Amino acid sequence: MTVGIVGLGLIGGSLAKAYKKSEHTVYSYDIDKKILDFAILSGAVDDILSFENINKCNLVLLCVYP
């Protein structure tokens, strides 16, 4: 399954790690570029979620403050 996650805070980051641990493909986006870069370098996500790859996602999770 391919998952897109918007927001890599406490909830989004935890979900990204859990889906990645279950060997799913994880795309993610965060407003803070440093957090997004760290998530990619640490292996928590596969790539940046963008308009080009959002159509590949079976599930998109919005994990931002209301």
Give the positions of each predicted feature.
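Short acidic alpha-helix that forms the nucleotide-activated donor recognition element
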Residues: 55
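Short glycine-/small-residue-rich Rossmann-like dinucleotide-binding loops
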Residues: 64-66
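NAD(P)+-binding Rossmann beta1-loop-alpha1 motif at the extreme N-terminus of oxidoreductases
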Residues: 1-51, 59
